[in-house]
Amino acid sequence: MSADSSGKTGYTYADAGVDIDAGNALVKAIGPLVKATMRPGADGEIGGFGGFFDPGAAGYKDPLLVAGNDGVGTKLKLAIDTQRHDTVGIDLVAMCVNDLIVQGAEPLFFLDYFATGKLQNGVAERVIAGIAEGCKLAGCALIGGETAEMPGMYAEGDYDLAGFCVGAVERGEQLTGTKVAPGHVLLGLASSGIHSNGYSLVRRLAADKGWKLDRPALFDNERLLIEHLLEPTRIYVASLLPAVRAGEIDALAHITGGGLLENIPRVLPQGAHAVIDADAWEQPRLMAFLQAQGGIEPGEMARTFNCGIGMVLAVTPDKVEAVTARLNEAGETVHRIGTIEAGEKGCTVRGSTGTWSATADWETRHLG
């Protein structure tokens, strides 16, 4: 409580657990981070009631705006529990901007929402620094956000994140998947790790199996297990955008919750069925570790994790070589993982004996 010149006392917002000064200090601290993300069309100032963006200054003539929002899921809890806050902001941006590029849109600007019970220990600054880094990787401007200090809403040390992104694509150039037809080739871009889906199962395994997160991974003596688990989600925007604008890609699927099995059909028209050959790429060691630890069946892996493929492209056979070369040059690892066949809209993933630890040839399917 505070006292005025007459000696009277009264409640303050700080008495209730909200530190306005801490919030103002945070805005000041992140100012340089925000300015570092600026691009044509953005004004570079934060702290107002909203952020401005001029699509014309970004070079657009007749743009369609594409919007998306997402979070990081329970990967966030793993970061909180291990006090590793520096990369979940990259995950937040990645989950949003990768959802925009699959529609042919260039991410233009991003806003974040950070909520916690109490601002402390520089956690928010570290998280927002990661968000700014993700924005730079994606080429979009961080034009604003909301930091909410809400006593009593969260356990001590906990926080939540949400991201909001808007992109643009010139009218008529958006990716809708309607051009995909039997004969199209499916290319897969390697993921950087688990990305941001499947962490409720990961955390359950960690608890049940007693994993030592701060020790070297069983499959990699040179890196801690927690470092593998918190590897940031790969941002594919910079490498994919030139190919998208060149008209070389007919559909893109971001492999998130639901895995390969359920995400690929989201971008297919009726009459197109994706057939994925799991023998076409090597299962990442981290995925093999998760599968072995949980005794997870191949079909469950295909609908839970990205299994080493973070983005799937549908291209015509005559463009496979050029697209592969372009993406390799951009730093992507590209696998030819399947084809589109005539059939009910959906996806089949199949593998031979030994693939994904299977004891026999296997197949799993999702329709719709």
UniProtKB/Swiss-Prot annotation:
> Which biological processes are named by the entry's GO terms?
'de novo' IMP biosynthetic process; adenine biosynthetic process
EC assignment = 6.3.3.1
Q: What class of enzyme is it?
A: ligase
Q: What InterPro entries does the record tag this protein with?
A: PurM-like_C_dom (IPR010918), PurM-like_C_sf (IPR036676), PurM-like_N (IPR016188), PurM-like_N_sf (IPR036921), PurM_cligase (IPR004733)
Pfam families with a match to the protein in the record: AIRS, AIRS_C
Gene3D superfamilies for the chain:
PurM-like C-terminal domain, PurM-like, N-terminal domain
Compartment(s) where it occurs, according to its Swiss-Prot or TrEMBL record = Cytoplasm
Q: Which UniProt keywords apply?
A: ATP-binding, Cytoplasm, Ligase, Nucleotide-binding, Purine biosynthesis
Which GO cellular component terms, listed alphabetically, does the Swiss-Prot or TrEMBL entry include? cytosol
Asked if the record carries the keyword Cytoplasm, the reply is: yes
User: Pathway listed for it?
Assistant: Purine metabolism; IMP biosynthesis via de novo pathway; 5-amino-1-(5-phospho-D-ribosyl)imidazole from N(2)-formyl-N(1)-(5-phospho-D-ribosyl)glycinamide: step 2/2
Q: Which GO molecular function annotations are given, in alphabetical order? A: ATP binding; phosphoribosylamine-glycine ligase activity; phosphoribosylformylglycinamidine cyclo-ligase activity
Q: Which reaction does it catalyse?
A: 2-formamido-N(1)-(5-O-phospho-beta-D-ribosyl)acetamidine + ATP = 5-amino-1-(5-phospho-beta-D-ribosyl)imidazole + ADP + phosphate + H(+)
Asked if the keyword Ribonucleoprotein belongs to this entry, the reply reads no
Per the similarity annotation, which family is this? Belongs to the AIR synthase family.
What protein is this chain from? Answer: Phosphoribosylformylglycinamidine cyclo-ligase
Q: Which organism is it from?
A: Erythrobacter litoralis (strain HTCC2594)
Q: Gene for this protein?
A: purM
